[in-house]
């Protein structure tokens, strides 16, 4: 999803299907809300019973200071070290991340915090709890012992802790008798004290353990007496807070951050300046109907489809090289695996010295750097994603392949695929061309340039040697378009003419066009969707997996 691309409207039949799907979705949402309300009432009753039981445990236990629910006073960050047993227990101690628990810490006392991932009591005197912090897990053992001041009531208390409850554990690092297969850490914690910061509902709308299973594991379980649950996409997104806790999702958003970080890092090194453009506009930045319209103090306005116009105006303001990481809004009805109505755009604009190939040079250097950074810096995260969603590493060349649009059309023609030489490539043609490029050049990342002018935005510069083509390009990963870029028209009269041809009211972009009347440099740039970069790098099947809280034609919450 590049922040410069335009998406064709759906057919009437598709729109009708989506309207029907939306009605079904609303009914399902009401049903889901009713179920959740019923669940909430039941949980309130269970909570009252649990608290009563917890109090009775502590009243008859000489070691009651070593466990229990943290009080509200303590949670309000009381400065009094005697405000409660939890504050007294953790006073002066430093928390250790679960991921840092290693054999070198044997016999050390540690304070850790995490969620109850699994809770497995084996007797009234012994229990095992796996604690999870982000994607890291460690086994905690609670064993009744006078010597360690762990009583039977403490074991019972741990039995009551529901999955996903948030707890602090103080204990000693030891080695298990046998290597552990169900945790990321190969040490275990002998529990001395445990305090619950916040309890989770006993019955959750989805299990994090279920949500973390790979499709292969689910299929294999179907052949057993206890088949695993498959958590569908709508359920995941309805309860996104729970879904985000899986190791794969934790890794996906670490990878997303790394893409953004590497993007900023390289561009800063290349003397680019980060900018922030307005998202409220008087007109439409791209033209067409895919705009979120609203009223702005009595004036018609819209949400920006891209920072296109303002990043060009920044160049006219002599900032020379700029980039932006920010939200992009598209009121499209495309309910596909790769389109969102709101996404994060990575946009670049720069002066051109001589030829628009300078922009493609930057794309080449920038994205080879990003891909290399992901492979070198994020091995653990890529492994976590691959465990649930297996994929082959992206194939890319040190020097990115460039083909002209005409060369791409010819490759398709030779493969028996007929396309309009002056039209755009549809999804099937893009995938086929990606397959052909992989077979011939052994790369899944390439640039296709000199697109027909008719399929590009109004501000795209025409080719010098053929007015039917433009100084523009798209970039592809695994057969899907990911970046759109071009040299821009910097001559105001030509801009006015092209805007009119594209159905844009020139008055709504008059300040944009006027900025070129004061002397404007040759310039160009590109835009790419952050979510789509991560989706295609990891070969994921849906962009909603790489959007924290996705917005599509049918989803406005959570």
Swiss-Prot record:
GO biological process, one term: aspartyl-tRNA aminoacylation
Key words, A-Z: Acetylation, Aminoacyl-tRNA synthetase, ATP-binding, Cytoplasm, DNA-binding, Endoplasmic reticulum, Ligase, Magnesium, Metal-binding, Nucleotide-binding, Protein biosynthesis
Enzyme class, spelled out: ligase
Binding residue positions for L-aspartate: 286, 330, 484, 488
Regions recorded as binding DNA: 110-195
Reaction equations catalysed: tRNA(Asp) + L-aspartate + ATP = L-aspartyl-tRNA(Asp) + AMP + diphosphate
UniProt modified residues of type N-acetylserine: 2
Signal peptide stretch: none
GO molecular function term, any single one: aspartate-tRNA ligase activity
A GO CC term attached to the entry: plasma membrane
Enzyme Commission designation: 6.1.1.12
Region (Aspartate): 308-311
Protein family: Belongs to the class-II aminoacyl-tRNA synthetase family. Type 2 subfamily.
Functional summary from the UniProt entry: Catalyzes the specific attachment of an amino acid to its cognate tRNA in a 2 step reaction: the amino acid (AA) is first activated by ATP to form AA-AMP and then transferred to the acceptor end of the tRNA. Involved in the perception of beta-aminobutyric acid (BABA) and required for BABA priming effect in disease resistance.
Protein name: Aspartate--tRNA ligase 2, cytoplasmic
Species for this entry: Arabidopsis thaliana (Mouse-ear cress)
């Amino acid at each position: 999803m590049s922040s410069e691309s335009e998406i064709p409207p759906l057919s009437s039949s598709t729109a009708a299907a989506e309207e029907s799907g939306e009605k079904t979705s609303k009914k399902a949402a009401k049903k889901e809300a009713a179920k959740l309300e019923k669940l909430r009432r039941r949980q309130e009753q269970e909570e009252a019973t649990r608290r009563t039981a917890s109090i009775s445990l502590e009243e008859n236990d000489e070691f009651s200071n070593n466990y229990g629910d943290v009080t509200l006073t303590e949670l309000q960050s009381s400065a009094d070290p005697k405000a409660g047993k939890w504050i007294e227990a953790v006073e002066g101690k430093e928390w250790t991340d679960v991921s840092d628990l290693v054999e070198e810490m044997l016999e050390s006392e540690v304070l850790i915090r995490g969620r109850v991932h699994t809770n497995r009591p084996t007797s009234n005197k012994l229990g095992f709890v796996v604690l999870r912090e982000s994607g890291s897990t460690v086994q905690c053992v609670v064993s009744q012992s006078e010597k360690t001041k762990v009583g039977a009531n403490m074991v019972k208390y741990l039995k009551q802790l529901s999955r996903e409850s948030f707890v602090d554990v103080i204990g000693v690092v030891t080695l298990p008798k046998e290597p552990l297969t169900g945790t990321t850490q190969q040490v275990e914690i002998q529990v001395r004290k445990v305090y619950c910061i916040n309890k989770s509902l006993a019955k959750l709308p989805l299990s994090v353990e279920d949500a973390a299973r790979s499709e292969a594991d689910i299929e294999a379980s179907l052949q057993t007496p206890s088949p695993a649950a498959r958590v569908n996409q709508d359920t995941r997104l309805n309860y996104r807070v729970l879904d985000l806790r899986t190791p794969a999702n934790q890794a996906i958003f670490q990878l997303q951050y790394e893409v953004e970080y590497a993007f900023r890092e390289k561009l800063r090194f290349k003397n680019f300046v980060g900018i922030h453009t307005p998202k409220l506009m008087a007109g439409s930045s791209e033209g067409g109907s895919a705009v979120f319209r609203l009223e702005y103090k009595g004036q018609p306005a819209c949400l920006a489809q891209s920072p296109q116009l303002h990043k060009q105006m920044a160049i006219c303001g002599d900032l020379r090289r700029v980039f932006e990481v920010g939200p992009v809004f598209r009121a499209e009805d495309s309910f596909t695996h790769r389109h969102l109505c709101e996404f994060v755009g990575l946009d670049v604009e720069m002066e051109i010295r001589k030829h628009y190939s300078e922009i493609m040079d930057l794309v080449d250097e920038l994205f080879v750097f990003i891909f290399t950074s992901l492979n070198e810096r994020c091995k653990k995260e890529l492994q976590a994603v691959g465990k649930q969603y297996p994929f082959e590493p992206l194939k890319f060349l040190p020097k990115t392949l460039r083909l002209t649009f005409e060369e791409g059309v010819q490759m398709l023609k030779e493969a028996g695929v007929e396309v309009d030489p002056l039209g755009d490539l549809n999804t099937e043609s893009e995938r086929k061309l990606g397959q052909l490029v992989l077979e011939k050049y052994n790369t899944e990342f390439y640039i296709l340039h000199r697109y027909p002018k008719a399929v590009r935005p109004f501000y795209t510069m025409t080719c010098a040697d053929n007015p039917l083509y433009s100084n523009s390009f798209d970039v592809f990963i695994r057969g899907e378009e990911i970046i759109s870029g071009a040299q821009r028209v910097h001559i105001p009269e030509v801009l006015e003419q092209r805007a009119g041809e594209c159905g844009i009211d020139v008055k709504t972009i008059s300040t944009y066009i006027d900025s070129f009347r004061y002397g404007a440099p040759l310039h160009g740039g590109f835009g790419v969707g952050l979510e789509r970069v991560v989706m295609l790098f990891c070969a994921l099947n849906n962009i909603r997996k790489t959007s924290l809280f996705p917005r599509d034609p049918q989803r406005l919450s959570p």
